[in-house]
């Protein structure tokens, strides 16, 4: 029983294990695809729940950022354009930056605040807990009954809150996550492949899990 014989058996066993894992993953993906297909028509015709628009809840939007010099102004401006009652809308810019992003945010926040929007710049220097820590600390002083979170590269539509908040009228709903789109999908073959993978994840995988 030589060393090479042992290695041969070991490789066969590892190959068999890899095949089993691939098979199990394929079965899981197939089941998600079947669930997605079964409920596709229902999702396509689903309407936004009825909601009492005179009794909208207060919403706080949190924007956690770290050294996002080139995109942070775009993010703040996009969120400031949300279609929502100004007296029920708060923006928290959670800034853990260590570069000139801090000054860029401060200037943009003052500009947005001058338009009558409730926005606050929370800058930390200790970075305790990193992103999760920033969100937790800010939540303690948030005014909103509901929290929306957007990363620095997000560009949510102006009607985002009006389209999502009504779902919370159901006691069965605790979290709402929406599907992403891609502003640079056609930039290169790599970005097209990345967009394809993310689209499959949100539509088939998440849709299938939700239907299960």
Per-region residue spans from a language model:
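N-terminal membrane-anchoring/stem segments of glycan-assembly enzymes
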Residues: 1-55, 206
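N-terminal signal-anchor transmembrane helix
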Residues: 31-88
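Structural beta-sheet core signal
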Residues: 61-63, 91-93, 175
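Short beta-strand/turn micro-motifs composed of small residues
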Residues: 63-65, 95, 150
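Well-ordered alpha-helical segments embedded in enzymatic catalytic cores
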Residues: 71-78, 104, 134-137
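Acidic donor-binding segment of Leloir-type glycosyltransferases
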Residues: 77-122, 127
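The conserved acidic donor/metal-binding loop of glycosyltransferases
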Residues: 97, 135, 151-155
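Long helical/loop segments within the catalytic core of UDP-sugar-dependent glycosyltransferases
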Residues: 109-145, 158-212
